[in-house]
């Protein structure tokens, strides 16, 4: 019984290794996309956006270019710096708790 188990283990290892080195298993390699498909993705991004995406994927010590400019934050800062706005206006007031759950 043990001989049969060892023999089947050896045969399965040999078959798996043969399959791995055949065309069935690429071992992490990826096939190349056709040029017309890969070119479509680059048209969607501007040069700066593509550079930021590459920095995000590959990692970079300088995180400043990855920060996204947000108009809402600028408007909020302008609102907070006006004379009419006080910092308490930006906070939400607590509703009275009537113990109604």
Curated annotation (Swiss-Prot):
Q: Where in the cell is it found?
A: Secreted
Is the Secreted keyword given for this protein?
yes
Q: Name one GO molecular function term.
A: corazonin receptor binding
Q: Please report a single Pfam family linked to this protein.
A: Corazonin
Keywords from UniProt, A to Z, are:
Amidation, Neuropeptide, Secreted, Signal
Q: In which tissues is it expressed?
A: Expressed in central brain and the retrocerebral complex but not in antennal lobes, optic lobes or in gnathal, thoracic and abdominal ganglia (at protein level).
Question: Which residues does the propeptide include?
Answer: 31-101
* GO CC, alphabetical: extracellular region
Top-rank taxon of the source lineage equals Eukaryota
For the keyword Secreted, the answer is yes
The secretion signal range is 1-16
Could you identify this protein by its name? Pro-corazonin
């Amino acid at each position: 019984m043990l001989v049969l188990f060892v023999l089947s283990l050896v045969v399965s290892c040999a078959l798996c290794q043969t399959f791995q080195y055949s065309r069935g298993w690429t071992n992490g390699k990826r096939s190349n996309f056709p040029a017309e498909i890969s070119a479509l993705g680059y048209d969607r991004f501007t040069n700066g956006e593509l550079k930021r995406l590459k920095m995000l994927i590959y990692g970079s010590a300088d995180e400043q270019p990855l920060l996204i400019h947000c108009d809402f934050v600028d408007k909020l800062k302008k609102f907070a710096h006006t004379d009419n706005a006080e910092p308490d206006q930006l906070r939400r007031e607590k509703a009275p708790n009537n113990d109604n759950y």
